[in-house]
Amino acid sequence: MRRGVWWALVYLAAATVSLPPSHADSTLVFTAVAVDGDSAVGPMGRIYAGPQGVMTLGGQGAQSIADAQEVARRLNALAEEGLRPSDITVRRERRDWTILAGSQRIVQIDKSLAKIHSTDPKRLAKTWAGNLSTAFGRPYLSVRPIVVPVGETRAAPIKGNIVGPVSVLTEAAYVGASYDAKKKAVRVVGYDVGHTELVISDDRSSLRVPVRSAKYAARLIGPEAAGVTGNPAPADTIRRAVEATVAAQLQLEPGAWASISARVESIPPLRPGSFATVPVHVSASGQDYLPYRQSPVVTVHNEAVPMAPVDVLMVSNSPERLMSHGLWFEGSLKDYRSARLLYHHVNSTGVPSDLVIEAVNLGDRAGRLHLIAGKGGPSRDEAYAGHKGAREFLGNRAAGIGWTAPVPSGQAVPVFVQHITPGATASGILEIRALSPGDFSLRCYLSPPRSSWLPYRLKSYSPSPFLGRWHYPQPRLEVDASYVVGREWAFVSIGDQAIAGIEAGDKLAGNYGVIYDIALELSNPTAEPATVEILMEPGGGMARGTVIVDGRFVETSLLRRDSESSVAQYALAPGEVRTVTIQTMPQGGSNYPVRLVARPK
């Protein structure tokens, strides 16, 4: 390889990194063509500015043509940026001479490269630089292709050497365009979606510039504050509230997709009556849409929501094994202000899936729901999945930990999503309260997994065949019991008396999802101290339990026939009488009924 050509290639590669890419349209166009050299030099690459040759690279055979094409590409990039002739300079670097455009190297010339042209490096550098200055000094126009959002305006500078007045013509009604003489820019407003061209002309040149008018993939309206409850509300609940609020404010275009991420890592648990501000990252994209990026800051309040017993229990468990994707449960809140939904399903589709609980607003006004939730799984141990879901729900319910979710009119809002691996069980409980009157429907369906679940507008609605099934009003039972030291043991059955559903003949065997509030009176009429133990024992098959005893959570291990688990012990002084408050709930995946037993220790 000849030394001069080697230096040229080195600096061509360096310039490729630093020069701007070629994306604009220009009436000054550089091209590279192959020309014949003598037998010693071989093929050469000549660069033209329009019809005028400006430089010729040679000495390396076919590679010289490729090098010339690369130089032409970078000169076009400079033309598109409106390079001034005065920016073309030459500089000596030891024995060689370099042509620069501003601070960017175009080519470096040494004796070997100059010898091909029968001259020296300095003269060749000045000749080529003069050719480039002449080319960049001629009248020309350069404008980058324009992308304008519908309903917005964008300005694109006209670069180059303008001669005389400028006119701008549009070829379609999608956009409007005008020339800003003061800023030497064309201003374009997007009216509708479409692709067209602008014809930009001065006294010497005419240029066709592509224009695209497009919608953003989404738009964020608002802002609106988010709401949580709990003493305190933890970070994960704050995240749910903020993301649900932002999702309801995000107007997503058909076919677009989006992600919402609330940054709660540095947010401490939120006490009742307090508030915090949470940064959120929103991004949306889609085919034929403009990418949308926003970083709003959302205020979240820990507000007071009355926690009255719910009106109805809804159970999604038939069938327990879901063999296909689709809708498997629907319940209406039209006649209720609150509901508790228990779901317990096995993913038998053979593929990973998402179990989705969504709220549908069938009314003509926006509404808000308050949710308290607990989920278990995915797990191949269905008793463990049900136990974990019940434990999490009862814990959140006891502390009032929940969030509010806006539900815009005519939209379906995924309020709770659980991923299920093949063969695994998902089990959970949601307590839902309507904070404003409305016609809400709750639906449970299995779906292929998605990276994010967002509200969507209903194109139409028709009730599912499941609507109104497996509904059980007043899902709370109060039980009074007593145990007297020295007398017979006390037994409290949990799940033995099935509550009735709204459909004739429907009974909820096991009372899964029903809250039991038990007042157990313990008395010691003897003259001696006594210790009373409270235990849980299965009523038939294997079962687990979660019991809240005087505000203390107790979880049992997996109980089998003829086994038992201690729940609490109380030391009673002679003549002492005390009442123990117990709350529990039959949980999915276990065999209920079970029994609580009070007996002497």
Identify the residue ranges that each predicted region occupies.
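Extracytoplasmic soluble-region selector
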Residues: A135-L220, A247, A256-V264
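A short beta-strand micro-motif common to beta-rich folds, especially ectodomain repeats
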Residues: D192-R204, A276-A284, G428-L430
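C-terminal functional regions that serve as terminal interaction/effector modules
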Residues: G273-F275, V282-Y289, L522-K601
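Asparagine-centered strand-capping/turn motif at beta-strand->loop junctions
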Residues: H345-S353, E358-G367, L371-A373, G377, ...
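Intrinsically disordered, low-complexity Pro/Gly/Ser/Thr-rich segments with frequent PxxP/GP/PP motifs
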Residues: H387-G423, G551-T581
